[in-house]
């Protein structure tokens, strides 16, 4: 069978296959390549690039096929698969020198092994998203083979479903025919990226990345994590004040979609960045962003402030726009808009404590899932207002909503409800000391921790995310960086509450959950190193957070939620440390990062 889509001379890969593919029957290759093996791969690929004789290559047992791709400034300029046929011809061609990859600055190498057939009836399990970037897939039909390497799927941000669709198109058949007639297989691969810019350096990756150990969560590392996220926010704020909503690192382009709730959360994050740093320029940037969003999406209707996008006016967008204005030191500039937006939240409140979640179209309020988000966002606005100024009537409405949604949540629990309500109720608890609020914060977050218990699903890089794969929890939604981020925002408040109440058992549980969540979030950050070999515009990608370990799309709330949680944590631990040191107290009460 001949592989489809070969853009390179077969010699380039066949020489590697000759040296890497062993006799049949040997064991799997080592999971971790030795330094001599990596150096040998680097020298060999560099020699292939330059058309020079190959140096002696360290043997790597049990490799069945080789995928090699050349990259120039983050763009793939050639790639090919080769297996072990025609070795003599391949060596002769290689001796003449490969004409491909002369301009490459990086090479992506996948050494494939462990090929095994796939049953189309069980593709959902065998090609579950969690295997993306770890397993490759092979499709054979009519004497033609199409393969997708795990690292290639990461670089192209390609799901298994899209890979099969792409294969069907290349093979000239439809999806149904592919499932019935094609031979499907999956395989594993050792993934190596080689920097060819000077002395070649080979780095082994897992899922196109480095898997962070628990020990990576240190105070210094978390501070750098926050700094890099803040840098992404700043670089993706445009000159006119527009914030990037969703960015594709592979193709260096933005999505044309948008979301008002996430945009206004980004506005709030920019303001908090400026307040935390005391940077007047950052506050000016946040103000510019608020002005841009108001100019584009705000209007006044019968005295009510509206945030509208494509005919939709959501309670959550209105509330978060008001909160972003409220927290900015220059809020007086936007006083009229703020008052009208607050009036809209009051207009959508109901006497039983519930909220109408959509102003327009009103019928969208019938969707019960929206009550997991928008009311909590609104109560956070109200709690922030009450923190600044007493208002007996608003306090009464706040508590009415608290009691309504406490019962509502118990009847239909979802984790997405918890962080917003936790933050709102913690603000009120700080001022009132309400046992009702305290107990409910603990009850919500105790349950939330169960979402993290089984976070290691097949691979170490998934540890710490808030996702439970149990079938009865499928309706909670897929794993997502923004979810981990917002859960961290709420958990740090719950942790502070547990410390204040001297509840050591809860404090330890919340602390460990926060540390695990931080490891997961740090795992998702794009760094300016060999793990970005596929990104043509590193400046726009660095510091951003992938959506998952296998999906490199950066959505603004991936970064914003996580950054706001980390900023809150760093501020708390710093203040708490000073209090403890001055009092000579035990540092056990701190969130230990070092």
Predicted regions and their residues:
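Basic nucleic-acid-binding interfaces
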Residues: 27-199
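Carbohydrate-binding/catalytic loop surfaces
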Residues: 243-259, 302-323, 355-377, 419-434, ...
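Solenoidal tandem-repeat scaffolds enriched in leucines and small polar residues
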Residues: 344-403, 407
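CBM-like carbohydrate-recognition segments
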Residues: 258, 452-490, 494-594
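Extended, well-ordered alpha-helical scaffold segments
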Residues: 218-233, 278-296, 330-348, 389-408, ...
């Amino acid at each position: 069978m001949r592989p489809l889509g070969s853009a390179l001379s077969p010699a380039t890969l066949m020489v590697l296959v000759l040296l890497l593919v062993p006799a049949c029957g040997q064991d799997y290759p080592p999971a971790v390549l030795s330094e001599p093996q990596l150096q040998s791969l680097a020298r060999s690929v560099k020699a292939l690039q330059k058309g020079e004789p190959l140096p002696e290559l360290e043997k790597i047992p049990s490799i069945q096929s080789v995928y090699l791709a050349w990259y120039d400034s983050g763009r793939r300029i050639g790639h090919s698969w080769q297996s072990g046929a025609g070795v003599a011809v391949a060596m002769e061609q290689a001796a003449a020198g490969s004409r491909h990859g002369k301009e490459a600055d990086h090479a992506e190498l996948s050494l494939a092994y462990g090929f095994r057939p796939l049953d189309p009836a069980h593709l959902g399990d065998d090609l579950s998203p969690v295997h993306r970037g770890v397993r490759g897939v092979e499709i054979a039909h009519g004497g033609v083979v199409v393969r997708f390497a795990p690292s290639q799927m990461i670089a192209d941000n390609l799901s298994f479903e899209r890979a099969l669709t792409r294969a069907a198109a290349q093979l000239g058949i439809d999806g149904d025919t592919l499932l019935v007639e094609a031979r499907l297989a999956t395989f594993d691969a050792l993934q190596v990226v080689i920097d060819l810019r000077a002395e070649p350096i080979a780095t082994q990756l897992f899922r196109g990345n480095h898997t962070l150990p628990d020990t990576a969560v240190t105070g210094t590392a978390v501070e750098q994590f926050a700094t890099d996220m803040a840098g992404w926010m700043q670089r993706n704020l445009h000159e006119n004040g527009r914030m990037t909503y969703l960015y594709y690192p592979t193709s260096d382009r933005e999505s044309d979609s948008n979301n008002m709730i996430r945009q206004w959360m980004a506005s709030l994050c920019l303001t908090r960045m400026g307040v935390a740093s005391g940077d007047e320029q950052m506050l000016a940037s946040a103000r510019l962003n608020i002005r841009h969003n108001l100019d584009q999406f705000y209007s006044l209707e019968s005295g009510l402030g509206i945030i509208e996008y494509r005919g939709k006016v959501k309670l959550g967008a209105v509330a978060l726009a008001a909160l972003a204005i409220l927290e900015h030191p220059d809020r007086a500039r936007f006083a009229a808009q703020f008052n009208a937006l607050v009036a809209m939240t009051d207009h959508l409140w109901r006497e039983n404590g519930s909220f109408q979640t959509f102003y327009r179209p009103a019928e969208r309020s019938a969707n019960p899932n929206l009550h997991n988000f928008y009311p909590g966002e609104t109560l956070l606005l109200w709690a922030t207002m009450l923190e600044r100024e007493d208002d007996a009537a608003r306090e009464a409405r706040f508590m009415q909503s608290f009691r309504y949604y406490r019962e509502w949540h118990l009847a239909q629990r979802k984790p997405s409800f918890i962080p917003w309500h936790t933050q709102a109720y913690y603000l009120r608890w700080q001022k009132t000391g309400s046992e009702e609020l305290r107990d409910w914060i603990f009850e919500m977050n105790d349950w939330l921790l169960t979402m993290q218990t089984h976070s290691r699903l097949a691979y170490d890089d998934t540890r710490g995310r808030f996702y439970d794969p149990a079938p009865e929890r499928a309706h909670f939604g897929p794993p997502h960086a923004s979810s981990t981020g917002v859960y961290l925002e709420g958990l740090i408040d719950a942790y502070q509450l547990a410390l204040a109440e001297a509840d050591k058992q809860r404090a330890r549980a919340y602390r460990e959950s926060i540390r695990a969540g931080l490891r997961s979030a740090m795992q998702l950050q794009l760094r300016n190193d060999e793990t970005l070999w596929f990104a043509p515009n590193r400046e726009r990608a660095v510091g951003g957070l992938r959506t998952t370990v296998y999906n490199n799309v950066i959505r603004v709330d991936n970064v914003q939620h996580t950054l706001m949680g980390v900023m809150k944590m760093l501020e708390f631990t710093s203040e708490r440390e000073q209090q403890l040191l001055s009092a000579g107290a035990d540092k056990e009460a701190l969130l230990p990062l070092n």
